[in-house]
Swiss-Prot record:
GO CC aspect terms: plasma membrane
Assigned protein family: Belongs to the gamma type-C retroviral envelope protein family.
Family matches, as SUPFAM superfamilies: Virus ectodomain
Descriptive protein name: Syncytin-A
Motif (CX6CC): 497-505
Its job: This endogenous retroviral envelope protein has retained its original fusogenic properties. Together with Synb, participates in trophoblast fusion and the formation of a syncytium during placenta morphogenesis. Syna is essential for placental development and is specifically required for formation of syncytiotrophoblast layer I (SynT-I). Promotes muscle myoblast fusion. Does not have immunosuppressive activity.
Length: 617
């Protein structure tokens, strides 16, 4: 199988910094080779594969699990607002409804859903199930869902180079409700956290919930019905656990959810783990895991809070679908009350995306930036890089630098490929001159015909190429317009390529190269046409005479012919003129001579005075 390369670069002992986007990979490769004291670090070919679906991955260190932020994207839907819609456009959609004040006398549950969304939007506690913090970021305010996510796998043939220190696993009892992203084998995970989405529900009194305290304190708010939420996920490490210490300092900067109390009571469950880094097996690292907030803290490292509210473990655990119901007591005609009747208000879908460049989730053989809401499988954090191969500097590379060679083309075919037109021209000349001196006249005539046919063919080819290039330019313009329109239509899903989960294809305009080649073909055709129509070439004198003398051959030969045949021409001309003159004189004077002789022989007589008689006539 022929390996396709995007480029190959020769490394030297002293490589300077490069500004190109792909050069950091080459510099990093050389740095790693130098640290490993490899012989390839001083002089070798570094080749990067152009196959975007194939890549290599290195396990991320444990500090990446604590210092890598994540972005939360929330989609909501209700019966009145059928979705799902991004939570960021909630205020715009709520403008289509009249302001409502929630109270228990609402009969229509859709009105209560709109009222619930309006109240939570006005109080500024959206996203409803996300963190509640006084820290406001200038880019997205309190929302962490403004960034457009990148859905789907980035590569599907990723190979993990070594064992990961930490993995996360999550599976659903009903696989129909899950999105399987991939599964890493147990041998590639030093330790695995087991995440379990809960199917239970929790009813919360709004008056006792920190998250909804501003809602209950609003003037005119008469909402007294309890709410029911989807239950929280759980984490199991399989290790001995203990009660986590209560943290009052950073309590309000944690990802608070309606089923959380701040500070947590009872105390959260924590695990202590001793793990090894991928590149350092002699110095273990101890970490603690809070199963309530899904928080990882490394011993001897500074707590990243409140700077980063969502860790990768939090995002992986909280990803899912959540629903909110309202307890709706029904009053019968006889005055009785039917309890435990809940009406659905809102459904929320949580999806988390890594917000740090260079860090990816590896699930099985696929890498992701965003985990789907109901993801299932076994994943870990990795650093991804393209497939890089090293070749000795004395090895010949069969493809040019910065060239793309399709893998479907055999190497033998690529080596046999020769330019067609020069090859045909060479064969024509060889066949014309191969008959020798005996057949030089005949072969020259045949070669003239072949050259004329080749000239016509080149001109037709050039015309066809220009016509095809015009069609391609026109088609490319239409395709690019359609591409821009499709990107606008699916902009919320990341654009056309991400929506289709395919590689992006871009049009590279090579019209300049094509038109230049066509111009060369026309020039070649013109030269061949001129050579074919020249009678000097037909005489076989062209190659042995200079060009300036060739242009004077016609008048010189004409003058020489006149000088050589001048006496004959003059004699012929004189004789012809004399003969023509004699003939002319003879024809002109012959009648006049006869009349003169006739006049000499006749005699003069007197004319009669009387009229002649009739019988005399």
């Amino acid at each position: 199988m022929v390996r396709p390369w995007v480029f190959c670069l020769l490394l030297f002992p002293c490589s300077s910094a490069y500004s190109d986007s792909w050069m950091p990979l080459v510099n990093l490769t050389q740095h790693l080779l130098q640290e490993a004291n490899s012989s390839f670090s001083s002089n070798c070919w570094v080749c990067l594969s152009i196959q975007t679906q194939r890549s290599l991955a290195m396990p991320a260190p444990l500090r990446t699990w604590t210092e890598t932020p994540m972005k939360l994207r929330i989609m909501y839907s209700a019966r009145t607002l059928s979705g799902p819609y991004p939570i960021t456009d909630l205020e715009r959609r709520l403008q289509n409804f009249q302001p409502l004040t929630p109270h228990s006398s609402f009969v229509n549950p859709d009105q209560r859903a709109i009222a619930f969304l309006q109240i939570t939007s006005v109080t500024g506690i959206l996203p409803i199930l996300s963190r509640i913090t006084s820290v406001r970021y200038p880019d997205d305010h309190v929302y962490e869902s403004a960034q457009r996510p990148i859905w789907g796998s980035l590569s599907t043939q990723t190979i993990l180079t070594s064992q990961a220190p930490l993995c996360i696993s999550r599976f659903f009892k009903n696989s129909n409700h899950a999105t399987f992203v991939g599964k890493l084998p147990a041998s590639l995970c030093n330790h695995t956290f087991q995440l379990s989405p809960s199917a239970n529900h929790q009813s919360i009194d709004l008056s006792s919930s920190y998250a909804f305290a501003p809602l209950m304190a609003m003037p005119g708010s008469k909402w007294r019905n309890p709410l029911r939420f989807s239950g929280p996920p759980s984490l199991n490490s399989g290790m001995p656990h203990y009660s986590c210490p209560i943290d009052d300092i950073h309590c309000h900067t944690y990802p608070t959810t309606p089923w959380r109390s701040c500070p947590s009571f009872p105390a959260s469950t924590c695990y202590n783990l001793t793990l090894f880094e991928p590149d350092n097996s002699s110095h273990p690292i101890t970490l603690s895991v809070d199963t309530t907030y899904f928080k990882i803290k490394l011993q001897g490292h500074k707590d990243p809070y409140p700077l980063f509210q969502y860790q990768p473990l939090m995002g992986a655990a909280l990803s899912g679908q959540y629903s909110i119901w309202e307890y709706e007591p029904t009053v019968k005609k006889n005055g009785g009350i039917t309890p435990n009747i809940f009406s659905h208000l809102v459904s929320l879908t949580y999806s988390f995306c890594l917000n740090s460049s260079g860090v990816f989730f590896l699930c099985g053989n696929s890498t992701y930036v965003c985990l789907p809401a109901n993801w299932s499988g076994v994943c870990t954090l990795v650093f991804q890089y393209p497939d890089i191969e090293l070749l000795p500097n004395n090895q010949t590379i069969s493809v040019p630098l910065f060239a793309t060679v399709p893998s479907s083309v055999p190497a033998s075919r690529r080596k046999r490929a020769l330019p067609l037109l020069p090859l045909l021209a060479g064969l024509g000349i060889a066949s014309a001159l191969g008959l020798g001196i005996a057949g030089i006249t005949t072969s020259t005539v045949y070669f003239q015909q072949l050259s004329k046919a080749l000239s016509d063919s080149l001109d037709e080819i050039a015309t066809s190429i220009i016509s095809l290039q015009d069609q391609i330019d026109s088609l490319a313009g239409v395709v690019l317009q359609n591409r821009r329109a499709l990107d606008l239509i699916v902009a919320e899903r990341g654009g056309t390529c991400l929506f289709l989960q395919e590689e992006c294809c871009f049009y590279i305009n090579q019209s300049g190269v094509v038109r230049h080649a066509a111009r060369k073909l026309r020039e070649r055709a013109s030269e061949l046409g001129t050579s074919s129509s020249s009678w000097i070439q037909w005489l076989g004198l062209g190659p042995w005479l200079p060009s300036w003398l060739t242009s004077l051959m016609a008048p010189i030969l004409f003058i020489l012919v006149l000088l050589v045949f001048r006496p004959c021409l003059l004699n012929c001309l004189t004789h012809s003129v004399s003969r023509r003159m004699s003939s002319f004189i003879h024809t002109t004077t012959e009648g006049h001579v006869d009349k003169i002789l006739l006049l000499r022989e006749s005699q003069y007589k007197r004319l009669p005075q009387e009229p002649p008689e009739e019988d005399a006539v």
